[in-house]
From Swiss-Prot:
Residues bearing PTM Phosphothreonine: T461
Gene3D superfamilies: 2.20.70.10, Pleckstrin-homology domain (PH domain)/Phosphotyrosine-binding domain (PTB) (2.30.29.30), Rho GTPase activation protein (1.10.555.10), SH3 Domains (2.30.30.40)
Compartment list: Cytoplasm; Membrane
Taxonomy, superkingdom: Eukaryota
Organism: Homo sapiens (Human)
Name of the molecule in the record: Rho GTPase-activating protein 27
Compositional bias per record (Acidic residues), positions renumbered to this chain: 329-341
Chain positions covered by the region annotation Disordered: 104-132, 329-397, 447-474, 617-655
Protein keywords: Cytoplasm, Endocytosis, GTPase activation, Membrane, Phosphoprotein, Repeat, SH3 domain
Modification Phosphoserine occurs at: S156, S216, S249, S347, S456, S466
Gene Ontology biological process terms in this record: protein heterooligomerization; receptor-mediated endocytosis; regulation of small GTPase mediated signal transduction; Rho protein signal transduction; small GTPase-mediated signal transduction
Length: 889
C-alpha cells in the first residue's frame, strides 16, 4: 500500500543492487549512498531520488534503512545488519598467518609507494586497491589528512620491540594485546569482525624471533612477512558530546632504513608507516582542507570521502555517502596530499553481511506508468554527473571516446572537439577535422530562456511556468514546482530543450523540389534551441533522448526554425486530421500530425513561438536578405546598395497582413534588381562560362566549335569499336546498359578529355549505344529535313540505275559536316557487315537499326509504317553502293 512521506526523509543504502528499468535506464545503488524518500509505493519498492536534482527512481525497500533527522550525528553511521548493543560484548579474535614475501623489501623496510597517497603497500596490494570499487563496493579506499604531531626519534625498528603500544582511543571497544615484531615485521592494529560491531578480528603477523606454533610447522621454511593493505576506516556513531570532543593528536616516530639510509616515519597509535614526512601538512593543520564539497564539520565529514574507480571513464572519483556528493580527482589535486591508512586485510573466512532477498517484482504493481518527471525537461537542467565533471557549455554534449579522451559534440553542426592539456596543465580544445586549436569551445547561439514546458508522460501535454525576471527555473521537485537559482548559475546550467514527443511526419518537398509520394512514419521529435529534429528510431528510450539528443539516435531530418513558416495544412495536402505544414527557409516542406488535437495544438504553439523569437532576434531586412541569397553565389549589387537596403526604415511586425505585404514587396524589389543585372546567355557563352553540350548540339555548330569536319566523339567511338573487334555478336543490335550510357553521356558533355579505354566503358555495347544516342538526339538528323522527301521520292523509283543515281546525287548535295560524317559512319558500317558471319549483322539488320535514326521527317506523318520502310531502304541502298557513293580520295 502506498504511503506518502511527510517532511524530508532520507534513506541510506546498506546493500548494493542493480537493475534495468522498463524504460531501458540502468539503475545501480551502492552502500553508504543517501537518497531522499519521495513515496513508499509498496512494501517492496520505494520511490527516491538523489539530492540535489536527480531523477526519481525506485529501489528495494529491504536494501535501505531510514535515517533520522540530519541534525543527529548518528545518522552518519554506516549500515549494519544489527543495532549496536548497549554494552560491549567480549571480543572474539581470529588469528591467521599471512605470507606475503613480495610485500617487504630485502631488509624488511617498506617498499616505496609510487601513487598519489604516501602509504606503503606491495604490488599485489596496490593492484587490489585499484580495483576495490568493482570488487568490493562497500569497502572504498579513504584518504585521510594527518595533522602535525611531535616526533619521538629512534634509530631503527629494533627500538620499537621494547616500546609499549596502546590501542588508539575510540577505535576498539576494549583493550587488546599487540605483538612486537622485528625489523621484518610491523605493528598491526586489530580489526573488528563483520559479525557485529563489538566483535573484532586480530590478524597477527608472524614474528621471526618467536617459534611458530605446531599447527603451522609447514611454514617454517618459508617465514611469513608482513602484509600491508589499504582499508577504509569505517566511521562509528558517537554521541553528540563525544563528537564535539577534540581528537588526540597522534605521535610520529622518525626511523632510518638500514638498507637505503632513507628516513621513514612510524605512528605507534595507528600502526601507519610512511616514507613521506607528516610535517608537510603542519601549515594546513590549523585549517585543514575539506573534501571536494565544502562542509561545516571538518571532523565528522572530512574523512567520509571515499575513493572509487569509474570503469567507463577509467578515472578516479570521490564520493561522500553522507552528503551524496561526487567529485573527480581533478578537483582535489590542489588539496594537501593525503595518506592511506595501513591496516591488515579482513580474514577471508570471516562471514560477510548477508543481503536481504530480492524483491518480488521489478516495479510496484499499483503503478502502471512511469513517474511524471521521467519525461519532463528536468534532465536538461541537472547538475553535471560523473560522466561530465566539467561544465559543458549550452549546445554541447560531452562524452569519453574509446581512446579515453574527452569529446565535445555540437548539437547543431555535429562538430567534435577534443579536450587536451598543455604542459602546464591548462586545458585547451583541438578540432581533428581542420587541426584548429582554441582555448574555449565555440559559442553556440542559444535564444533567450523562455517559459519551460513541463511535459507529461508522453511529452505532449506541457504546463507552462512563467519564471521571474531575475531568476531562471532550474530544477523540478517531486511535485512539479520550480526551484529558483541565481542568474549566474542558470547561465551555466540552463539549456534550451523546449519540447519532445512522438509525432507522425512526412517530407513533401526537398529544397523546393516536390516529392512524389508521402511516407508517413512515427518518430521521436525534439524541439531544442530553435531546431526541430526528427529521429529515425522512435523505440529508443525517450528519457535518454531528453538528456543527450545527439547520442539518442541518428537524426533523419533537422529543420532550422529561423526563417521558417508554420500553418495548418489544408485538406488537399493531407486527408488526415490535425496536420501542421512546416516550410523551412531552404524550401523544404514537412507535414506533422498527431491524433490528439490537444497535443498537436501544444506543438503548434511551441514551434510558432520558436519561429517568432528567432525572427525577432534578427532585423527584418537581414532575414529577407538571407532568404533571397540562399543557394545563390552571386551578389545582388554592390556593397553600397546592400548597406542602403539593410537600413531599417520601419520596424515591421514579423506576423500579420501588413508585414506580409511589406515582405513581398521587398522580395519583388530584390528579384527585379537581380534580373536586371543578370547577364545574357550569349554573353556567358562568349566569356566561356557556358558551353554547349555535345549531345543535342547541332552538327554544324559542333564541328565548327571543335574545328573538325567530323565530331570528335563519333571518331572516338568508331575507333574504339573497331579496336575491340568487329566480330562481336549483335554489334549495334544489342543495347548496352542504359545507366552506363547516361554516365558516358554526362562525361562527354562535361569533360573534354574522354578516354573510352577506361574500365568503366569496357562493354562495347555501351559505346555503340552512346553513338546511336548521339545521332538520335541531333536537333536535325544526319539526313536533313530539307532532303527527306527527295530521298523518299528517289527510293520509290522503279528503275534501279536511276534510283541509285538520284540517291548518290542527293548524298553529295548534303552540307559538308553531314556528308563527311555520313562517309565515316557508312564506311565503318560496311566493315561491320563484312564480319556478318561472326557478328550476325547483315545489310538489312544494320539498315533496320540506323534507318529511323538517320532519316526522319520533321513532322510525323500518318503513314508511319510505310515511311519507316522507305527509311530502311534508303540506308540499305547507300550501304550496298557505299564505294560508288563515297569514292576513296
Amino acid at each position: 500500500m502506498a504511503a506518502d512521506v511527510v517532511g524530508d526523509v532520507y534513506v541510506l543504502v546498506e546493500h548494493p543492487f542493480e537493475y534495468t528499468g522498463k524504460d531501458g535506464r540502468r539503475v545501480a545503488i551502492r552502500p553508504n549512498e543517501r537518497y531522499r524518500l519521495l513515496r513508499r509505493s509498496t512494501e517492496h519498492w520505494w520511490h527516491v531520488r538523489r539530492e540535489p536534482g536527480g531523477r526519481p527512481f525506485y529501489l528495494p525497500a529491504q536494501y535501505v534503512r531510514e535515517l533520522p533527522a540530519l541534525g543527529n550525528p548518528a545518522a552518519a553511521a554506516p549500515p549494519g545488519p544489527h543495532p549496536s548493543p548497549a554494552a560491549p560484548e567480549p571480543l572474539a579474535y581470529d588469528y591467521r598467518f599471512v605470507s606475503a614475501a613480495a610485500t617487504a623489501g630485502p631488509d624488511g623496510a617498506p617498499e616505496e609507494s609510487g601513487g598519489r597517497a604516501s602509504s606503503l603497500c606491495g604490488p599485489a596490494q596496490r593492484g587490489a586497491a585499484t580495483q576495490r570499487s568493482s570488487l568490493a563496493p562497500g569497502l572504498p579506499a579513504c584518504l585521510y589528512l594527518r595533522p602535525a604531531a611531535p616526533v619521538r626519534p629512534a634509530q631503527s625498528l629494533n627500538d620499537l620491540a621494547c616500546a609499549a603500544v596502546s590501542p588508539p582511543a575510540g577505535l576498539l571497544g576494549s583493550s587488546g594485546s599487540f605483538k612486537a615484531c622485528s625489523v621484518a615485521g610491523s605493528w598491526v592494529c586489530p580489526r573488528p569482525l563483520a559479525r557485529s560491531d563489538s566483535e573484532n578480528v586480530y590478524e597477527v603477523i608472524q614474528d621471526l624471533h618467536v617459534p611458530p606454533p605446531e599447527e603451522s610447522a609447514e611454514q617454517v621454511d618459508d617465514p611469513p612477512e608482513p602484509v600491508y593493505a589499504n582499508i577504509e576506516r569505517q566511521p562509528r556513531a558517537t554521541s553528540p558530546g563525544a563528537a564535539a570532543a577534540p581528537l588526540p593528536s597522534p605521535v610520529w616516530e622518525t626511523h632510518t632504513d638500514a638498507g637505503t639510509g632513507r628516513p621513514y616515519y612510524y605512528n605507534p597509535d595507528t600502526g601507519v608507516t610512511t616514507w613521506e614526512s607528516p610535517f608537510e601538512a603542519a601549515e594546513g593543520a590549523a585549517s585543514p582542507a575539506t573534501s571536494p564539497a565544502s562542509v561545516d564539520s571538518h571532523v565528522s565529514l572530512e574523512t567520509e570521502w571515499g575513493q572509487y574507480w569509474d570503469e567507463e571513464s577509467r578515472r578516479v572519483f570521490f564520493y561522500n555517502p553522507l552528503t551524496g556528493e561526487t567529485a573527480w580527482e581533478d578537483e582535489a589535486e590542489n588539496e594537501p596530499e593525503e595518506e592511506l591508512e595501513m591496516q591488515p586485510g579482513l580474514s577471508p573466512g570471516s562471514p560477510g553481511d548477508p543481503r536481504p532477498p530480492t524483491p518480488e517484482t521489478d516495479y510496484p504493481e499499483s503503478l502502471t506508468s512511469y513517474p511524471e518527471e521521467d519525461y519532463s525537461p528536468v534532465g536538461s537542467f541537472g547538475e553535471p554527473g560523473p560522466t561530465s565533471p566539467l561544465t559543458t557549455p549550452p549546445g554541447w554534449s560531452c562524452h569519453v571516446s574509446q581512446d579515453k579522451q574527452m569529446l565535445y559534440t555540437n548539437h547543431f553542426t555535429q562538430e567534435q572537439w577534443v579536450r587536451l592539456e598543455d604542459p602546464h596543465g591548462k586545458p585547451y580544445f583541438y578540432n581533428p577535422e581542420d587541426s584548429s586549436v582554441r582555448w574555449e569551445l565555440p559559442q553556440v547561439p542559444v535564444p533567450a530562456p523562455r517559459s519551460i514546458h513541463k511535459s507529461s508522460q508522453d511529452g505532449d501535454t506541457p504546463a507552462q511556468a512563467s519564471p521571474p525576471e531575475e531568476k531562471v527555473p532550474a530544477e523540478l521537485d517531486e511535485v512539479g514546482s520550480w526551484e529558483e537559482v541565481s542568474p549566474a548559475t542558470a547561465a551555466v546550467r540552463t539549456k534550451t530543450l523546449d519540447k519532445a514527443g512522438v509525432l507522425h511526419r512526412t517530407k513533401t518537398a526537398d529544397k523546393g523540389k516536390r516529392l512524389r509520394k508521402k511516407h508517413w512514419s512515427a518518430s521521436w521529435t525534439v524541439l531544442e534551441g530553435g531546431v526541430l529534429t526528427f529521429f529515425k528510431d522512435s523505440k529508443t528510450s525517450a528519457a535518454g533522448g531528453l538528456r543527450q539528443p545527439s547520442k539518442f539516435s541518428t537524426p533523419e531530418y533537422t529543420v532550422e526554425l529561423r526563417g521558417a513558416t508554420l500553418s495548418w495544412a489544408p485538406k488537399d495536402k493531407s486527408s488526415r486530421k490535425n496536420v501542421l505544414e512546416l516550410r523551412s527557409r531552404d524550401g523544404s516542406e514537412y507535414l506533422i500530425q498527431h491524433d490528439s488535437e490537444a497535443i498537436i495544438s501544444t506543438w503548434h504553439k511551441a514551434i510558432a513561438q520558436g519561429i517568432q523569437e528567432l525572427s525577432a532576434e534578427l532585423p527584418p531586412e537581414e532575414s529577407e536578405s538571407s532568404r533571397v541569397d540562399f543557394g545563390s553565389s552571386e551578389r545582388l549589387g554592390s556593397w553600397q546598395e546592400k548597406e542602403e537596403d539593410a537600413r531599417p526604415n520601419a520596424a515591421a511586425p514579423a506576423l500579420g497582413p501588413v508585414g506580409l505585404e511589406s515582405d513581398l514587396s521587398k522580395v519583388r524589389h530584390k528579384l527585379r534588381k537581380f534580373l536586371q543585372r543578370r547577364p545574357t546567355l550569349q554573353s556567358l557563352r562568349e566569356k566561356g562560362y557556358i558551353k554547349d553540350q555535345v549531345f543535342g548540339c547541332a552538327l554544324a555548330a559542333l564541328c565548327e566549335r571543335e574545328r573538325s569536319r567530323v565530331p570528335r566523339f563519333v571518331q572516338q567511338c568508331i575507333r574504339a569499336v573497331e579496336a575491340r573487334g568487329l566480330d562481336i555478336d549483335g554489334l549495334y543490335r544489342i543495347s548496352g546498359n542504359l545507366a552506363t550510357i547516361q554516365k558516358l553521356r554526362y562525361k562527354v558533355d562535361h569533360d573534354e578529355r574522354l578516354d573510352l579505354d577506361d574500365g568503366r566503358w569496357e562493354d562495347v555495347h555501351v559505346i555503340t549505344g552512346a553513338l546511336k544516342l548521339f545521332f538520335r538526339e541531333l536537333p536535325e538528323p544526319l539526313f536533313p529535313f530539307s532532303h527527306f522527301r527527295q530521298f523518299i521520292a528517289a527510293i520509290k523509283l522503279q528503275d534501279q540505275a536511276r534510283r541509285s543515281r538520284c540517291v548518290r546525287d542527293l548524298v553529295r548535295s548534303l552540307p559538308a559536316p553531314n556528308h563527311d560524317t555520313l562517309r565515316m559512319l557508312f564506311q565503318h558500317l560496311c566493315r561491320v557487315i563484312e564480319h556478318g558471319e561472326q557478328n550476325r549483322m547483315s545489310v538489312q539488320s544494320v539498315a533496320i537499326v540506323f534507318g529511323p535514326t538517320l532519316l526522319r521527317p520533321e513532322v510525323e506523318e500518318t503513314s508511319m509504317p510505310m515511311t519507316m520502310v522507305f527509311q530502311n531502304q534508303v540506308v540499305e541502298l547507300i550501304l550496298q553502293q557505299c564505294a560508288d557513293i563515297f569514292p576513296p580520295h
